[in-house]
Amino acid sequence: MTVKTTVSTKDIDEAFLRLKDIVKETPLQLDHYLSQKYDCKVYLKREDLQWVRSFKLRGAYNAISVLSDEAKSKGITCASAGNHAQGVAYTAKKLNLNAVIFMPVTTPLQKVNQVKFFGNSNVEVVLTGDTFDHCLAEALTYTSEHQMNFIDPFNNVHTISGQGTLAKEMLEQSKTDNVNFDYLFAAIGGGGLISGISTYFKTYSPTTKIIGVEPSGASSMYESVVVNNQVVTLPNIDKFVDGASVARVGDITFEIAKENVDDYVQVDEGAVCSTILDMYSKQAIVAEPAGALSVSALENYKDHIKGKTVVCVISGGNNDINRMKEIEERSLLYEEMKHYFILNFPQRPGALREFVNDVLGPQDDITKFEYLKKSSQNTGTVIIGIQLKDHDDLIQLKQRVNHFDPSNIYINENKMLYSLLI
């Protein structure tokens, strides 16, 4: 049997009909804060408000619903860092199918619990592997051994067609408001979302520039399309943006992206964290790291989008509240507002007061101080964290620290040491 490897607008239109009573029509909102910040019109497609809080339900339901009754009776499997798993679980419950869902051990607990909630007794969750790619290998082996049906999170034309319904929905909404998009920003993990969206836009909104956004620590599509002109597997990836941390994109999504995507942006994970905090405080939007990628990329494109009309897909809002401390720390590090040092303190009364008076600036704040006094030594080792009001104060701070202790270690520049603090 020949496996279909292309996606058409007809496929997306058919998927749209399958999904119209299943998925929520999520809002397309003009965002006044971002529009003012970037001197353009910025619209947000709020897939974080979908039933499973991400766009993944679209692709999962479409891919499962086209299976034959015989195939459905054998059960389904999937591998996912979280959102695709929730879409599969929701669908399994809706269609009363048995599903075995494989998730990386590193998946945030919030996403694991949501999968169990949406799937209930129809779903078994298996945590395995440190990355999506390791998890995928386990899932494929299990699927083959048990003769079940694997629902690919991105490298499947039915999954891609389902994700593409987001574009059809978006363009219908924009037509109602008489809006034409100059730029569209969307996250790339394995490439299913950007493939579906770009397929529809290239036919029905061909002047819109399609910009794919990846975390800088997992830019597998950029490395494949732009650097190597073939699908490559990244040897190492940063897993922080878990919803978009994929070492190898799909063969199908690679071909579609190569044809349709106009440009790629790699966003530092720290910048994503700053965006998450900004969206929460300014817009009351709870975005997960992958969901914030599209908005983060606007900073890279600020000169291009001035005076234009832009849409960003907020692809997901499944953020674990327990990660907020790390998100804040990564943001402060990226913004050069928080700094850690290892110092040798003289073991005598008044040494700390001397440090405060001689080293700290008038607006600097000590956020961490760890010190263990050793009576057998003249000095003791101190780990100290200092938060600045203005990152431009860093140069003078480091000069004062060096004067206080020339042998100090600046932890921010040592990734291994810094990882012990957050």
From Swiss-Prot:
All residue ranges annotated as the ACT-like domain in the record: 339-413
Pathway involvement of the protein, from the record: Amino-acid biosynthesis; L-isoleucine biosynthesis; 2-oxobutanoate from L-threonine: step 1/1
UniProt cofactor(s): pyridoxal 5'-phosphate
GO biological process: isoleucine biosynthetic process; L-serine catabolic process; threonine catabolic process; threonine metabolic process
Catalytic activity: L-threonine = 2-oxobutanoate + NH4(+)
Protein EC: 4.3.1.19
Single Gene Ontology MF annotation: threonine deaminase activity
Coiled coil regions, renumbered to chain: none
Pfam families per the UniProt record, alphabetical: PALP, Thr_dehydrat_C
Residues annotated as binding pyridoxal 5'-phosphate: N83, G189, G190, G191, G192, L193, S315
Keyword entries, A-Z: Amino-acid biosynthesis, Branched-chain amino acid biosynthesis, Isoleucine biosynthesis, Lyase, Pyridoxal phosphate
Record PTM N6-(pyridoxal phosphate)lysine, positions in chain: K56
Function: Catalyzes the anaerobic formation of alpha-ketobutyrate and ammonia from threonine in a two-step reaction. The first step involved a dehydration of threonine and a production of enamine intermediates (aminocrotonate), which tautomerizes to its imine form (iminobutyrate). Both intermediates are unstable and short-lived. The second step is the nonenzymatic hydrolysis of the enamine/imine intermediates to form 2-ketobutyrate and free ammonia. In the low water environment of the cell, the second step is accelerated by RidA.
Subunit structure, interactors included: Homotetramer.
Family, per entry: Belongs to the serine/threonine dehydratase family.
The protein's name in its UniProt record: L-threonine dehydratase biosynthetic IlvA
Source organism of this protein record: Staphylococcus aureus (strain MSSA476)
Lineage: Bacteria, Bacillati, Bacillota, Bacilli, Bacillales
